[in-house]
Design a protein with these regions (language model features):
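Bacterial N-terminal signal peptides
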Residues: 17-28
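Extracellular glycan-modifying ectodomains
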Residues: 2, 31-329
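Bacterial N-terminal signal peptides that target proteins for export
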Residues: 3-19
Length: 329
């Protein structure tokens, strides 16, 4: 289900666990390491153990910011704007649900705000997603699924709304209104969260129980409308996949077509960006704005993080710079 697609086109429906399995197994290592891939908190809340609760890599973060800044400058020469979205880590939102023997390091708690400040200092256009997710938490709505790595569809849509507002404030999009995605009706589906289904033995998985996934039905759109040029393109991982609705909501809020390139998380943001920039789609129709999505917990990992990305997603820094220059001559 990776690759380029228009918001609003229906996609092959897979079980929640199948959608996320590639991301999780690759990030956590082999199946034999599955038991150590999950932190079991209070009230059945699960957290990914590959996102450290204690360590912060400031040097890696600074390097990633410099790489993103270089991409921004290369895109600017082509009159393409870049909006950077970094999804906050799950654990700081639910610190009270972490096990008592695995508390959050204060440095980890402060990291997201510091990252936002550093990106703005570097001149990057970014959206502070943390307050958006905090506002999402009310009543039965949560920012993240209880036993899942991912944010909820509510978080995805609220972030998409804020992203659309940012884009409309900064850029005058080409094309006529009326090309936005049509949103389907909400429905509930009970399923095991990916952290439970992929990493816990059956007896523990049963004890954790299923989560309720409130998501939208996919809506088939008029293909003539979908053929209109898209002024905005989204690049990211399974957080922006169609199942959770970010791109459809962004298209709906902008009232313009929005295209999407996404891969499972083990491919990494760097290779996914290159996949799009090297594609015939980009060569034939360049967007006005690229929205590039990262995750806080992996932001410090560069293109050369061979222990974290799959073989196709790893490249040396020198090769990365060469590839960017070739894709954006």
């Amino acid at each position: 289900m990776s690759g380029l697609m228009k918001a609003g086109l229906s996609s092959r429906r897979l079980p929640v666990s199948a959608l996320f399995a590639g991301l999780l197994l690759s990030l956590s290592g082999t199946a034999a390491q599955a038991a150590s891939a999950v932190i079991t908190g209070k009230d059945g809340w699960l957290f990914p153990a590959w996102e450290s609760l204690s360590k912060v890599d400031n040097a890696g973060t600074a390097r990633s910011i410099a790489l993103v800044k270089d991409v921004q400058q290369q895109l600017q020469r082509k009159q393409i704007a870049l909006v950077v979205l970094v999804v906050p880590m799950k654990a700081p939102f639910y610190a009270q649900r972490l096990p008592a023997d695995q508390p959050l390091n204060p440095a980890v708690v402060k990291r997201y705000d510091q990252l936002q400040g550093a990106m703005k200092t570097a001149g990057l256009t970014t959206l502070d997603i943390k307050p958006i997710l905090q506002q999402t938490e009310h009543g039965k709505q949560t920012a993240f699924y209880r036993a899942d790595y991912h944010w909820t569809a509510w978080s995805a849509e609220n972030t998409a709304d804020a992203t659309a507002k940012l884009i409309n404030e900064r850029y005058r999009l080409q094309g006529e209104p009326g090309g936005g995605a049509v949103l389907g009706d909400w429905f509930d589906k009970r399923a095991f969260g990916d952290l439970a289904s992929n990493f816990l033995p059956a007896i523990k998985r049963k004890a954790i129980g299923r989560d309720i996934y409130t998501v939208r039905h996919q809506v088939e759109k008029d293909l003539l409308i979908d053929d209109a040029p898209a002024p905005v393109h989204v690049i990211g991982n399974s957080f922006v996949q169609p199942y959770l609705g970010f791109t459809q909501k962004l298209s709906n809020a902008l009232d313009r077509p929005v295209t999407l390139t996404w891969n499972p998380g083990d491919v990494g943001p760097w290779a996914t960006l290159l996949q799009y920039l090297e594609s015939p789609d980009f060569a034939q129709q360049k967007p006005q704005v690229i929205v590039w999505q990262f995750n806080e917990g992996q932001f410090h990992l560069g293109p050369d993080a061979s222990a974290n990305w799959n073989a196709k997603g790893v490249t040396s820094l020198s090769q990365w710079h060469q590839s960017i220059k070739k894709a954006l001559p």
